[in-house]
A protein has these predicted regions:
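Solvent-exposed loop/turn segments at secondary-structure junctions
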Residues: 51-56, 85, 91-96, 131-135, ...
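Extracellular glycoside hydrolase catalytic/binding regions
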Residues: 63, 67-68, 156-159, 163-173, ...
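An active-site-proximal structural segment forming one wall of the substrate-binding cleft
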Residues: 67-84, 100-131, 135-173, 189-201
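C-terminal motif of bacterial Sec signal peptides marking the signal peptidase cleavage site
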Residues: 15-18
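N-terminal carbohydrate-binding accessory modules
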Residues: 24-85, 348
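Bacterial signal peptide processing site
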Residues: 20-22
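Surface-exposed, active-site-proximal loop segments in enzymatic domains
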Residues: 56-63, 92-109, 133-149, 254-259, ...
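Sec-dependent N-terminal signal peptides
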Residues: 4-13
Length: 361
């Protein structure tokens, strides 16, 4: 600017001052960093986890003995209830029996058949790799980042899954990993998640990627274990952060004791998701609660669930209840109907089918 002024000394003073002010104004505008934009909220469905494909300890195991897939019966039941988001847990060992090998054709067909059936019914699917940051190799469990199981190995399977499902209109998101925890210091969850995001985006630039929190994805302890996830980079800017929460004393979801012995209150659920929701707002990020559930043996749990879901709904955070599926039997958290009769928790779930953007605080 000074060089320009010196070379134009013949310009009258009034014009010089005018130009200087205009230039300074322009300079300020071009050097001010753009404001960080928050997420654009739209109405999102709540739903359920439909379990079965992640069942069993034998890997890969036998279909319909060690594990199964949810059926059309489950899809129709929850679709008719208006719960149109399904989190589908699956095991890495089954969809890709050999590291960096091809996807198993039969297992892939089961997954695709389920996704296709959901698509024809207007039901959205989250593909949830239910592996906790680990995988069994020859019957022995290894953690990602160990000599036996590299970050590149898990990136490979997600690249192949993305190629297979990127054209589906009802994939709500790729759930990178269920509940990573106690990861290696040399290979933290942040580094793994970033590698998976980068790899997926080489083949699919559109589908949402769900990044679970570290430390079992705890919403309650999110700032402690998962604060650094705000620094993940997605060239498509389409990440959703996934937390889990349960209302028993240790937030494990075991519910070993009574409502009173678990020190639960009507506001336990709200109190435990507040740290996660506040983190989302502070960092202008989008979130999702992939697991929450209550027993059917005390109606007070239902009020705790109701209050939490209302809080989530009014803060534009949707979620999926844990759980449903054909093999749950007498599991007290299950919302699979018994003999055609709705479970008690269903009454609460039906009050909270979608988020309400106009109410978002």
């Amino acid at each position: 600017m000074k060089r320009i002024l010196l070379s134009t000394v013949f310009i009258v003073a009034t014009v010089l001052v005018c130009c200087k002010k205009k230039a300074e104004t322009t300079l300020k505008k071009t050097t001010t960093p753009p404001a960080v934009q928050g997420p654009v909220y739209k109405s999102e469905f709540f739903g359920v986890n439909l379990s079965g494909a992640e069942f069993g300890v034998n890997m890969p195991g036998l279909f319909n003995r060690d594990y199964t897939y949810p059926t059309i019966v489950e899809l129709d039941y929850f679709k008719d209830k208006g719960l149109k988001l399904v989190r589908l847990p699956f095991k890495w060992e089954r969809i890709q029996p050999s590291l960096r090998g091809p996807l198993d054709a039969l297992e892939l067909s089961r997954m695709k058949n389920f996704v296709n059936a959901a698509e024809s019914r207007g039901v959205f699917i989250i593909l949830d790799m239910h592996n906790y940051g680990r995988r069994k190799i020859n019957g022995i469990e290894h953690i990602i980042g160990s000599p036996e199981l590299s970050v590149g190995d898990v990136a490979d399977v997600w690249e192949k899954l993305a190629i297979e499902f990127k054209t589906k209109t009802n994939i709500w998101g790729y759930g990178l990993m269920n509940e990573p925890h106690a990861m290696l210091t040399s290979t933290p969850w942040f580094d793994i998640a970033q590698a998976l995001i980068t790899k997926i985006r080489t083949v699919d630039q559109k589908t949402t990627i769900l990044v679970a929190g570290d430390g079992w994805s705890s919403a309650w302890r999110w700032p402690q274990f998962s604060n650094n996830l705000k620094n993940l980079v997605d060239p498509s800017r389409n990440l959703v952060f996934e937390a889990h929460i349960y209302f028993d004393n240790d937030a494990s979801g075991k519910y070993d004791q009574s409502y009173d012995a678990e020190n639960a209150t009507a506001n336990t659920g709200v109190e435990r998701v507040i740290p996660f929701v506040k983190w989302l707002k502070d960092n202008k990020l989008k979130g999702f609660v992939g697991e929450y559930g209550v027993p059917d043996n005390d109606s007070r749990w239902l009020l705790t669930l109701d209050n939490m879901l209302k809080y989530l709904k009014d803060n534009c955070v949707n979620g999926t209840y844990w759980a449903a599926g054909p093999w749950w039997g007498s599991y007290t958290l299950a919302v699979e109907p018994k003999n055609g009769v709705d479970r008690p928790q269903m009454e609460i779930l039906l009050k909270h089918k979608t988020t309400v953007p106009e109410n978002c605080k």
